[in-house]
Amino acid sequence: MAFLGNPKNTIEVLQKYNFNFQKKFGQNFLIDTNILEEIIDSAGITKDDMILEIGPGIGTMTQYLCESARQVIAVEIDTNLIPILEDTLSEYDNVKVINDDILKVDINALAEEYNNGKPIKVVANLPYYITTPIIMGLFESHVPIDSITIMVQKEVADRMQVGPGTKDYGALSLAVQYYAKPEIVANVPPNCFMPRPNVGSSAFAGEKTATDYGAAYTSYSAGASGSASALGSESKTDGVTNESGDFGGQPEPD
């Protein structure tokens, strides 16, 4: 199977499986090899690493991750993409695809099973409609994470870096800056995706620095300028609330 990081190979796979994009899942697949390589390089992946990929799509970035890491766990919510992933990733024996909602996946259990409980690295082209719950959940849950390298809406990436007292400072800014050192590693125009999103994107990297999930974070929140309102009213740029996932809680009954 050829690498998918270009329009030609991506279109061939989509046509082969007669795949239709679903807007409800915020699907925009990367088709630029340069951006893919920048993301992989920024993640600092080694052959000792376990990678959690959220939303692998057709496996474009997953292929690159499999080439670089010891183990890749790819969590995909869209059932229609599973047979495609089985095809595009068939040459790799170091990848496991899980068909589930990432907010309901027990990441601690995965880290324990596939990485002996050691910290993992998260790499993802995140669906923009659910960016905040995923990021907040990753940082605020007791998930063993070494670093995150993710693609997000540019406006959201910019918000992660603003300081207290600015109008865009909110719960996401506070959490990211408390738990990691945020850095934008690439600004990505819409033409690097298929289909093209209506907004610009940025690849964001952050090495996790804080490990105290309790009193220290509460104290930091209370002392931050404007934190009381920030924690209760996150910006709605990505179209979601600031509720984070539990990453291991029981699924709600149907």
Regions found by a protein language model. Give the residues of each.
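Extended, hydrophobic beta-loop-alpha segments that form or line the acyl/peptidyl-thioester binding
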Residues: 220, 232-235
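Catalytic cores of RNA-modifying enzymes
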Residues: 1-222, 228, 245-253
